[in-house]
């Protein structure tokens, strides 16, 4: 029997593990052979859960952030973390790493990038940085304090994580255009939250971008994810109460 992941195999800011139980309930409300389109694929967790719960469905995962590349490099990431763990032996757990040990760790990461051409900096960040900090390069990491938070166990290879799922990599508006006329299509809408951290997303988000997303919802079935830290629902409520207010600028 296929394993269903309750959280993404690799770290990702904004993955929907806390919503999984409620999301599973919602999936049962749609008819057989429904087409689900995950417009903001992120870690792919929503697409994965959808395909596991609804194997009859067509599931489209928009992997705009190229999470697949991170998954494909899990074996190399595990080796790198194992080497970093060895370098940090004797360093107190969760304490700051400085001096020669810090330099050796950066040298090992640099060698990985030179020899293999790729380092999963988001996953490495989860083992070396605190407070949900993530970097995208060694240059950025060298500016940060690093800590001995290195994961003790290897990451699962997750080879079946995206099994049976159609994968695309486009701007969400292009994906929407491709599927908007499919009968009964359901859009899974999980944009980076307004007023929250969007650092691991490749696109830059402005207020206008969030409002553009709302045009996708009109006239279609959708599951929309938000947060009590986001202001988007408050904004929509204000717009509903003030429909005739034009721009004062």
Segments and roles (model prediction):
Residues 58-60, 185-187, 219-226:
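Hydrophobic beta-strand segments of well-ordered beta-sheets in folded domains
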Residues 207-249:
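Long, positively charged, glycine-interspersed low-complexity recognition regions
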Residues 58-162:
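Class I S-adenosyl-L-methionine-dependent methyltransferase module
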Residues 46-52, 70-73, 179, 196-202, ...:
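A short acidic (Asp/Glu
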Residues 164, 168-210:
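Active-site segment flanking the S-adenosylmethionine/decSAM binding pocket
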Residues 52-58:
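Conserved S-adenosyl-L-methionine
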């Amino acid at each position: 029997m296929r394993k269903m992941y309750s959280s993404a195999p690799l770290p990702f800011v904004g993955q929907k593990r806390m919503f999984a139980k409620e999301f599973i309930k919602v999936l049962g409300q749609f008819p057989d052979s429904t087409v689900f389109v995950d417009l903001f694929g992120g870690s792919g967790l929503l697409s994965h859960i959808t395909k596991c719960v609804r194997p009859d469905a067509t599931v489209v995962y928009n992997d705009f952030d190229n999470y697949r590349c991170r998954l494909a490099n899990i074996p190399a990431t595990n080796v790198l973390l194992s080497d970093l763990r060895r370098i940090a032996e004797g360093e107190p757990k969760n304490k700051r790493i400085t001096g020669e040990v810090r330099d050796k760790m950066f040298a090992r990461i640099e060698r990985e990038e030179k020899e293999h051409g790729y380092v999963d900096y988001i996953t490495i960040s989860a083992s070396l940085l605190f407070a949900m900090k993530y970097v995208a390069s060694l240059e950025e990491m060298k500016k940060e304090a690093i800590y001995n938070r290195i994961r003790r166990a290897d990451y699962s290879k997750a080879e079946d994580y995206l099994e049976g799922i159609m994968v695309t990599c486009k701007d969400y508006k292009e994906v929407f255009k491709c599927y908007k006329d499919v009968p009964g299509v359901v859009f899974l809408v999980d944009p980076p939250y307004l007023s929250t951290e969007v650092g691991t997303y490749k696109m830059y988000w402005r207020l206008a971008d969030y409002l553009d997303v709302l045009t996708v919802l009109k006239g279609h079935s959708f599951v929309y994810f938000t947060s009590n830290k986001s202001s988007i629902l408050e904004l929509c409520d204000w717009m509903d109460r003030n429909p005739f207010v034009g721009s004062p600028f």
